[in-house]
């Protein structure tokens, strides 16, 4: 089975790289197509995958096609519906649910195009990702099972109802940027008090990774973990109170709301 990436920006490349490095796909099975052919060829060469000169070439070579273009470009790249007949389309575009594709394909209901909408995040590149999969889709049962099995090699896959697809996508897909901001802020504080920049980034990143792992593996509630770290009249509780005074919780909720309003 060959897999194509129609669009090869940050998210498409992260997912392709993760799947190849995890061994879920062989490089020889993977193709990509993008407008900037020079950049595409360089990226494909580094991964050992095939670069396609046109959408038509990619479609001809692929059974599964990841749509990794902007939502505004979807109708354009799918203009030639006939060439996608019998293919499995896997959307990575924010705001493009199953219903959106059904509306797009409504004029040609018999072309046999099956589709599923996903919202992955960049950590898929290192097999530590999260992928939100919309529960509603038009894939055959065996196709759906096979696809989820492949995706689980690089991510925690969460299947959610359409009503929660957007909010789950924001938490999984946008929040890595929020987490990176938090890491950067911690590192800035470390540098302010004498740490070397690279060491400060290492400490902050590993702290966040370890804290997340502890919550996942032990099942401890985040509030309980916070309480475990805070000793009476200690330095940690002083820091926690400072975060509350500065509105950390409110800022995070506002950030999610802002991201959700544009999805």
From Swiss-Prot:
PROSITE patterns: P5CR
Pathway given in the UniProt record: Amino-acid biosynthesis; L-proline biosynthesis; L-proline from L-glutamate 5-semialdehyde: step 1/1
Gene Ontology molecular function terms on file: pyrroline-5-carboxylate reductase activity
Keyword Nucleotide-binding on entry: no
InterPro entries, alphabetized: 6-PGluconate_DH-like_C_sf, NAD(P)-bd_dom_sf, P5C_Rdtase_cat_N, P5CR-like_CS, P5CR_dimer, Pyrroline-COOH_reductase
Keywords, in A-Z order: Amino-acid biosynthesis, Cytoplasm, NADP, Oxidoreductase, Proline biosynthesis
Entry keyword Amino-acid biosynthesis: yes
EC number, as in UniProt: 1.5.1.2
Pfam families for this protein: F420_oxidored (PF03807), P5CR_dimer (PF14748)
UniProt-annotated location(s): Cytoplasm
GO BP terms: L-proline biosynthetic process
GO cellular component: cytoplasm
Catalysed reaction, written as an equation: L-proline + NADP(+) = (S)-1-pyrroline-5-carboxylate + NADPH + 2 H(+); L-proline + NAD(+) = (S)-1-pyrroline-5-carboxylate + NADH + 2 H(+)
Similarity-based family: Belongs to the pyrroline-5-carboxylate reductase family.
UniProt function note: Catalyzes the reduction of 1-pyrroline-5-carboxylate (PCA) to L-proline.
Name of this protein: Pyrroline-5-carboxylate reductase
Record organism: Treponema pallidum (strain Nichols)
UniProt lineage: Bacteria, Pseudomonadati, Spirochaetota, Spirochaetia, Spirochaetales
């Amino acid at each position: 089975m060959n897999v194509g990436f129609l669009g090869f920006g940050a998210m498409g490349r992260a997912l392709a790289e993760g799947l190849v490095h995890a061994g879920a796909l062989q490089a020889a099975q993977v193709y990509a197509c993008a407008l900037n052919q020079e950049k595409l060829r360089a990226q494909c060469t580094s991964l050992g995958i095939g670069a396609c000169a046109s959408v038509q070439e990619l479609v001809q070579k692929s059974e599964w096609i990841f749509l990794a273009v902007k939502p505004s470009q979807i109708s354009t790249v799918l203009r030639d519906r006939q060439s996608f007949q019998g293919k499995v389309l896997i959307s990575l575009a924010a705001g493009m649910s199953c219903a959106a594709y059904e509306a797009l394909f409504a004029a040609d209901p018999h072309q046999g195009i099956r589709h599923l909408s996903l919202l992955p995040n960049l950590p898929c590149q290192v097999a530590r990702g999260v992928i939100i999969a919309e529960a509603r889709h038009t894939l055959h049962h065996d196709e759906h099972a096979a696809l989820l099995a492949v995706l689980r090699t690089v991510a925690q896959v969460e299947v959610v109802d359409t009503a929660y697809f957007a909010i789950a996508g924001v938490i999984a897909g946008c929040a890595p940027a929020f987490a990176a901001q938090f890491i950067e802020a911690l590192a800035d504080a470390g540098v302010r008090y004498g740490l070397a920049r690279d060491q400060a980034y290492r400490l902050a990143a590993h702290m966040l990774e370890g804290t997340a792992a502890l919550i996942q593996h032990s099942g401890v509630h985040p509030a309980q973990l916070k309480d475990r770290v805070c000793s009476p009249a200690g330095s940690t509780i002083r820091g926690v109170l400072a975060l509350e005074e500065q509105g950390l919780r409110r800022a995070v909720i506002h950030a999610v709301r802002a991201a959700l309003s544009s999805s």
